[in-house]
Design a protein with these regions (language model features):
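A short, ordered amphipathic alpha-helix with a cationic face
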Residues: 124-128, 152, 169
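Conserved NTP/Mg2+-binding pocket subregion across the NTase superfamily
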Residues: 34-142
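Short, surface-exposed helix-loop/turn micro-motifs enriched in polar/charged residues
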Residues: 7, 149-150
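Short helix-adjacent coil turns
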Residues: 142-149
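Glycine/small-residue-rich interface belts in oligomeric ring/scaffold proteins
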Residues: 20-22, 26-39
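Charged/polar positions within long, soluble alpha-helices
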Residues: 136, 143, 162-170
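Small-residue-rich helix-loop
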Residues: 154-159
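Active-site nucleotide-donor binding segment shared across nucleotidyl transfer reactions
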Residues: 1-24
Length: 170
């Protein structure tokens, strides 16, 4: 539903910008969108948010070298998927390309498809362990009748289950 209603508070257009090196300062990026209002930049997380023609946009600047390292070695840095799960890989693989200056995205997708089964097994094992952790948290939340902890634990369980499904169906 929110995908069709621009005024739904959950609706926004999310853009991943894969880049190399340092990103330009926020004022330079803001100047690239002259019609934008309410521009805010989160430099620590390399994200910009703004409204253009009443449509909310979120741009996240992603370092190509991080993905190159992951895709060429098949090894993820410790905690690489802890907060995002496999969502970043899903977006890399299935996101719609609106603009590209090189064939990097095409090559990255080929590299993602070529990752060996050991990589996917490692991810599956890690995410299944997290699912078990969240399942234990759910049990504790039910036993203590803690609605907030139940909500947090169930969201973690569902998100991790989605990561397991992505890994299985990669």
């Amino acid at each position: 539903e929110s995908g069709e209603d621009f005024y739904d508070p959950y609706f926004f257009i999310s853009v991943d910008c894969y880049c190399t090196g340092a990103i330009p300062p926020s004022h330079t990026r803001r100047d690239l969108f002259p019609g934008a209002v309410a521009f805010e930049s989160l430099h620590a997380s390399r994200k910009d948010r703004f409204l253009m023609r009443d449509i909310p946009f979120r741009i996240e600047y992603k370092d190509q070298s991080y993905f190159d390292s992951l895709l060429h070695t098949g090894e993820a840095p410790e905690g690489a998927f802890r907060d995002t799960g496999t969502y970043m890989l899903y977006r890399l693989r299935h996101g719609t390309v609106a603009f590209k200056r090189s064939d990097w995205i095409d090559e990255a997708r080929k590299d993602l498809d070529a990752l060996n089964q050991d990589f996917w097994n490692m991810l599956r094992t890690a995410f299944q362990a997290r699912m078990e952790h969240f399942l234990g948290d759910l049990h504790a939340a039910i036993a203590r009748e803690d609605e907030l902890f139940y909500l947090v634990s169930s969201s973690g369980f569902i998100r991790t289950a989605c990561s397991v499904l992505f890994v299985i169906n990669h």
